[in-house]
Amino acid sequence: MLPTDRADLLVRVEALLQQCRGPQAAIRMVDLFALATGDVVIPGKRYDQTRIVRSLVDQLRRQGCPIAHGANGYFWADDPADLEPTIRWFHLRALASLRQERALRRVPFAAVLEQYRLDLEAQPDDPLPP
């Protein structure tokens, strides 16, 4: 891996993704990892090795970068419509987690949702990126 800190790697990942405009230019995680770090992915270690890059993609999304993903990999979405499948995927994943919580707590799904509504009302909103 190239000697770098997280901030430098974040800049590299963002720059690489900005070059991948639209779903037709998507980049696979293993390729993004290799280009950002200068390292190769070992097949049996793919998930562990790419964890840092996945966390940086998450950080960029939380900063408001329009990073989508699809069957061909990650890409910078110039068209807001290209973000919809990614947004839907996150939505379904969140609902699946809440269903698991409902089953573990043995309460109705509506009760789990109500608790989160109350929790969110008690917390200040996270500022949205510009």
Region locations from a protein language model:
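Short acidic, hydrophobic short linear motifs in intrinsically disordered regions
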Residues: 23-41
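A short, conserved structural fragment
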Residues: 61-71
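Short, hydrophobic-biased segments on the C-terminal half of alpha helices
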Residues: 54-58
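Exposed, interaction-prone assembly regions rather than primary DNA-binding/catalytic cores
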Residues: 100-130
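Short alpha-helical segments that sit at the start of domains
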Residues: 1-19
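Short, positively charged loop/turn segments that connect secondary-structure elements
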Residues: 37-53
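Minor-groove-contacting beta-hairpin "wing" of winged helix-turn-helix DNA-binding domains
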Residues: 70-78
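Short, amphipathic alpha-helical interaction segments positioned at domain boundaries
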Residues: 81-105
